[in-house]
Amino acid sequence: MSLPYFLADDPASGVLTGAEAKHAHVKRIEPGEHIMLIDGRGSAALTRVTSVTPSRVDGVVEKQTRVPQPSPRVTVVQAVPKGERAELAVDLAVQGGADAIVPWISHRTISRWPANKQAKQVEKWRAQALSSAKQARRAWVPEVREPVTTNQLSALLRGAKDERRGDERHALVLHEDATASIRDVDFASLGEDIWLIVGPEGGIGDDELEVLGAHPVKLGPEVLRTASAAFAGLCAIGALTARW
């Protein structure tokens, strides 16, 4: 059975404080047990627990590890789903291996985030990403970025393309009407940074596809829910590249 993961400011210290210490206490972690401390940026420390309180956990670090980031790096652009499906989308994307997640307020997005509530929603996504990363035993916790509109996303994609050599389309958009299969993508030409775009429940409009300039691909004949599409796409990319 894999060890439980906890986020620590400094895994090498063998110390947990704050919410993570409370979490360990609630999980009834006891002295003598082993846990894995991570910093969310690839550093991990196998730790034998020596004491547990609701506010602090102390332990002895037995082994330190540096986990390399998967390559190629995949950023998921997730159109914001409505209700509880939003957190499900984040959960599945993290389980699938997303390296970063960008909330997207597309033209057809049903769930709109008012300006005065955006910060709270982003924090919910970040909390979910951390929880899911620990559950998935990941040393890297995906970054959840600030939400973007379609025009802002287009600018992000152009900026990412400008940093690369060549003019390959490095962004893939999952689309039910695409004629190309994801298995036919020449991933070697996309470089070390791939953007995977998932549309809303109402679908991505033709005008948005044109603005984004992304490469439409399909996973198969089935139409997936927006909350599960990124997971399926990430699994396909994992199998078709060196990520897995």
Predicted feature descriptions by range:
Residues 66-170:
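RNA substrate-binding interface of SAM-dependent RNA methyltransferases
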Residues 206-244:
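Structured adenosyl-cofactor binding patch, chiefly the S-adenosyl-L-methionine
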Residues 186, 190-210:
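A C-terminal functional module that forms or caps the active site or interfaces directly
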Residues 144, 171-173, 214-218:
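Conserved beta-strand scaffold positions in the cores of enzyme catalytic domains, especially
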Residues 1-66:
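N-terminal positively charged helical leader segments and presequences
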Residues 74, 169-172, 192-198:
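Generic beta-sheet signal
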